[in-house]
Amino acid sequence: MELLKVIKSQDKITLKTEKVNKNVFFYFKNKKKILLKITFSGELFLKERTLITLNNLNYSNYSNYIKFMAKNLETFFYDQYNYFSKLHMIGLGFKNFILRKHLYILVGDCNYIIFRIPDSLKIFCKKNQVFILGESNVEIFNFMSNIKRVKKSNFYKGKGVLQFKNFKFTKLKVGKKQRFM
């Protein structure tokens, strides 16, 4: 853990470490935290519309000091948005990725299904998971329902496009026991 000095300017705050001469830039807009640029070994540029999680970074604000701790930066982004939801794609043949403002999903077919991402939502993907952040719960639910309509989920096997908050596995009824003589 290192303590960093804060150098204030008009729109951005520059943080300089005393040991290493590296800069970190944060940008505050309407009392919201937005990460603008991080320079460690290379340069990484983030704008308001992009959403990227960086491992092992988290900050808490003190008077003229910011302390970095070993946690994920996902909590940094959750402060901007009120609602969050996660979709799991369980089964064979599921692939997803984001290209520009479109979400591409392969659901066991030979063609990708393309969804246009609304401006009010932020979406990022892992292997078989889609994370959706937004300002209203209705917009998130509408976008998730469009994705769920693509492939009908099988509740008995637990496969398909699932949201685990509302999902419950249904158990099959046990058959009659056979007698052996």
UniProtKB/Swiss-Prot annotation:
Cellular component terms per the entry's GO annotation: mitochondrion; ribonucleoprotein complex; ribosome
Keyword Mitochondrion among UniProt keywords: yes
Location relative to the cell: Mitochondrion
MF annotations from Gene Ontology: rRNA binding; structural constituent of ribosome
Keywords noted in UniProt: Mitochondrion, Ribonucleoprotein, Ribosomal protein
Major location category of this protein: mitochondrion
Source species, domain of life: Eukaryota
Database matches in SUPFAM superfamilies: Ribosomal protein L6
Family: Belongs to the universal ribosomal protein uL6 family.
Protein name (record): Large ribosomal subunit protein uL6m
